[in-house]
Amino acid sequence: NKAVDFSFRNVSYHVEIVGVDVFPQGFAAVADRLSDFRGVNMICDIGNGTMNIMFINDKKPVSGNMFTEKYGTHQCLLAVRENVMRIHHTTVDEAIINRVFRFGTADIKEDYLKTITDTATDYVAGIFKRLREHEYNPELMRLYVLGGGSCLIRNFGVYDASRVTINDDICATAKGYEYLAELNARKGNSR
């Protein structure tokens, strides 16, 4: 369709589509810094349900080297709930789990916190295992982690901080798309 009609919050809209640009997941968040991506770089965008992996080699995305794993923050949350139920025979509110994910701690008893952090640490080890399955080698490349799940890496990962960049700005992708649209408009490619 070249035009779409819809209403949102009791306001009717008519939108004409004049062009579409498609970018790999995670690319927009780093598009304004491509000049920093010398050598081999792995991008890891950890979302709620998936983890998207791509390579940028010498400032250029490698189109044949992009992967999606069903290994996002929600799966970690489910693992935490399961372990808390198994060990403590109780449920834990999602807000508590998310607070531990984001900050590494919460105002709860130490044994519950240990169960949550141990589970998150194991889960993050699984993230790095999957990255290695896609040829991640910290001695040969840099890792750039973004998305809502980047806090898991920051708080529970074991990594060389000089070789890993964590961008926990959850608006990074939206800012990147805005940057790419402005770049297109400046080049005269607005349709």
Give, region by region, the residue ranges found by the protein language model.
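Nucleotide/phosphate-binding catalytic cleft detector across ATP-hydrolyzing
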Residues: 1-43, 61-75, 95-191
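Active-site-proximal alpha-helical scaffolds that flank and shape metal-associated catalytic sites
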Residues: 44-48
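Short beta-strand scaffold segments in enzyme catalytic cores
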Residues: 51-55
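A short beta-strand motif that forms part of the nucleic acid-binding face
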Residues: 57-59
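Active-site-adjacent segment of 2-oxoglutarate/Fe(II) JmjC oxygenases
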Residues: 83-95
